[in-house]
């Protein structure tokens, strides 16, 4: 399996640009904030964005819980995935996710600055400061994945 690691600071538009990276590199699946996404559909895991505390969100994003970790490992193994994009805030975080999910350690690194213009980075930061989140799944999947956000 070919692994791509998209990394950058929080609020820089990684999830937004992941759609472009998936298309450009022909990537089959994405790991973003604790969920496995295939064809823009949430297929396994639970989102770190649902956590109220930063510490809990980080643990969720790196698959600290054994049940969460195993659910995603099983889903990956049940599918024919030749390439995967892992989104994280640092290379270290992505390597931790790779280790926890027992994925190949050879990573093609994609810094967000390689995919974003300075203007796009500025817009992403402004949106993040307003509390907006981009999620690389189909709109129909959003409420199922992010329960409680719309009430």
Residue ranges and their predicted role:
Residues 39-40, 94-97, 118-121:
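Switch/connector loops and helix/strand junctions flanking conserved nucleotide-binding motifs
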Residues 2-22:
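Glycine-rich phosphate-binding P-loop
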Residues 9, 34, 88-90:
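Fold-independent oxyanion-binding glycine-rich loops
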Residues 76-108:
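Helical/strand "switch-coupling" subdomains that flank nucleotide/phosphate-binding cores, especially
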Residues 28-85:
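Conserved nucleotide-sensing/catalytic segment adjacent to the nucleotide-binding pocket
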Residues 19-20, 27, 36, 87, ...:
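Polyanion-binding and phosphate-handling cores
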Residues 107-151:
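C-terminal accessory "lid"/substrate-recognition subdomains
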